[in-house]
């Protein structure tokens, strides 16, 4: 039996997730992984088993290296050693992406899982994201989910203009209600 579109399921489309990450791993020398939503570390087992790795998860029953709010970690921790940031969230990865873009220097890969199309179609995107996109706080836009690619482009451009994280190259794929994106970024200032 399949799960309804709104029900979260860990690692649906595992093949696509692994393929996107394997592409990203080839983009950096000596990858050092920061996994912001590590869960039960299925992706670590599939992609990162022999690599330096640090996993974050809020749930205390997971084998994470630290159990905390990943935004707090991204705001305060030294991110210098990480050059591969994995943000596999059930919803909107852009808050974490923007924090990484603000604080990370040098060349790095960011892998994002977006499951925001359902939220976007119901106009449940964050106030912050609406602000960046130029959408008034209370405005409801029918079928906004059709513009996921445009919204992703705006967020990447915002990271470049606001924080100097230059987008170099990337790939994307989608399946069901999830979009997968890996981008190579470089920040020199």
Protein language model features and the residues they cover:
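A conserved mid-domain beta-alpha-beta active-site/ligand-binding segment of alpha/beta enzyme cores
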Residues: 128-186
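A short, conserved alpha-helix within the catalytic core of class I
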Residues: 91-104
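Short, charged, surface-exposed secondary-structure boundary motifs
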Residues: 63-66, 119-124
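Structural motif
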Residues: 32, 83-84, 109
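Conserved beta-strand positions in the Rossmann-like core of class I SAM-dependent methyltransferases
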Residues: 54
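Conserved beta-strand signature within the Rossmann-like core of class I S-adenosyl-L-methionine
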Residues: 107-121
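S-adenosyl-L-methionine
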Residues: 1-50, 58-84, 179-181
């Amino acid at each position: 039996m399949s799960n309804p579109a709104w029900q979260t399921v860990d690692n649906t489309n595992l093949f696509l997730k692994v393929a996107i990450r394997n592409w990203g791993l080839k983009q950096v020398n000596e990858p050092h992984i920061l996994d912001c939503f590590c869960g039960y570390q299925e992706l670590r087992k599939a992609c990162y088993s022999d690599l330096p790795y640090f996993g974050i998860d809020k749930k205390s029953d997971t084998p994470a290296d630290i159990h905390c709010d990943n935004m707090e970690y991204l705001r305060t921790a030294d991110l210098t050693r990480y050059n591969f940031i994995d943000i596999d969230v059930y919803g909107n990865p852009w808050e974490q992406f923007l924090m990484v873009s603000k604080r990370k220097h040098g060349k790095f890969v960011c892998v994002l899982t977006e499951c925001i199309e359902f939220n976007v179609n119901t106009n449940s995107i964050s106030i912050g994201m609406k602000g960046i996109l130029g959408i008034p706080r209370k405005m409801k836009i029918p079928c906004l989910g059709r513009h996921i690619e445009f919204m992703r482009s705006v967020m990447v451009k915002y990271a470049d203009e606001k924080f100097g994280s230059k987008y170099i190259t990337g790939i994307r794929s989608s399946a069901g209600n999830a979009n997968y994106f890996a981008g190579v970024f470089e920040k020199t200032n």
